[in-house]
């Protein structure tokens, strides 16, 4: 990958120096197409979401364990180049009177290097890590996971922590409408979200985990990032007049997808 980047930079310099040449202009056009393709390929990423529920009285112990042990293992995998990033989030909108706390782990992975990480022996002893894992399992009441493919959006730089809050909208979409739905989100709603100063990040993710023929399961997740909970309230509170064009745009997206559920999450830990 480093070799590819060096070649990429060298060609850019040569094209800049010779930009007045007609032949080089033609070559530049071809190269720009290559650059766009290269940039798109570099964005390909899987995001695995791991939902873990513990009793409310065990929530802080669970956070402490993640901070002391497992976040360091993920950081090691990131430094080794076998993982892109890892975040731990807390579900902020559970059911009323819920006696449990749900955490959501986001594993940012390279599709071509999926699950290709191990280690930890040089950080912790085998017995210490084994005990931490055992206690981790004892606290967990239930868990589940889903794998998603990042389709596009705008997010913080790879070496930056994400904003403090995220809203995950789980979308039900007919397989017949997958392509049109993706294009509508990426070409129409992505620019709108990017122009909204309250929204600090936005991403479209397609669920790639098998759904066991469940026609009521969500097919996509739209993630919207914010700096604070008041910013989320402010966004939800906005009621603006719509032009005929905007009404038609929203009617189109509403015909393509249905929101199954929404999760509001707050950031607990992050490793990059």
Language model: regions and residue ranges:
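Short alpha-helical segments used as structural interaction elements across diverse proteins
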Residues: 22-26, 130, 254, 258
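Short S/T/G/P-rich N-terminal loop/turn motif that feeds into the first structured element of a domain
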Residues: 41-126, 134-272
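Bacterial Sec-dependent N-terminal signal peptides
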Residues: 1-44
């Amino acid at each position: 990958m480093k070799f590819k980047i060096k070649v990429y930079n060298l060609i850019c310099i040569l094209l800049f120096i010779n930009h007045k040449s007609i032949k080089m202009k033609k070559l530049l056009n071809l190269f720009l197409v290559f650059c766009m393709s290269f940039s798109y390929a570099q964005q390909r990423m899987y995001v695995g979401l791991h939902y873990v529920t513990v009793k409310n009285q065990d929530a802080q112990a669970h956070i402490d364990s993640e901070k002391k042990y497992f976040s360091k293992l993920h950081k090691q995998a990131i430094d080794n180049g076998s993982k892109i990033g890892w975040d731990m989030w807390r579900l902020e909108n559970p059911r009323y009177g819920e006696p449990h706390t749900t955490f959501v782990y986001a594993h940012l992975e390279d599709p071509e290097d999926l699950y290709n990480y191990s280690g930890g022996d040089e950080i912790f002893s085998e017995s210490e890590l084994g005990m931490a894992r055992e206690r981790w399992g004892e606290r967990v009441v239930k868990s589940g996971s889903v794998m998603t493919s990042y389709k596009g959006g705008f997010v913080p730089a790879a070496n930056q922590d994400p904003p403090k809050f995220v809203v995950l909208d789980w979308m039900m979409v007919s397989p017949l409408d997958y392509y049109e739905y993706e294009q509508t989100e990426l070409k129409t709603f992505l620019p709108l979200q990017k122009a909204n100063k309250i929204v600090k990040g936005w991403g479209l993710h397609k669920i790639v985990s098998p759904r066991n023929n469940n026609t009521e399961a969500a097919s996509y997740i739209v993630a919207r990032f914010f700096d604070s909970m008041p910013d989320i309230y402010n966004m939800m509170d906005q009621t603006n007049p719509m032009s005929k064009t905007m009404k038609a745009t929203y009617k189109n997206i509403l015909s393509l997808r249905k929101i199954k559920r929404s999760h509001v999450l707050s950031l607990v830990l992050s490793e990059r």
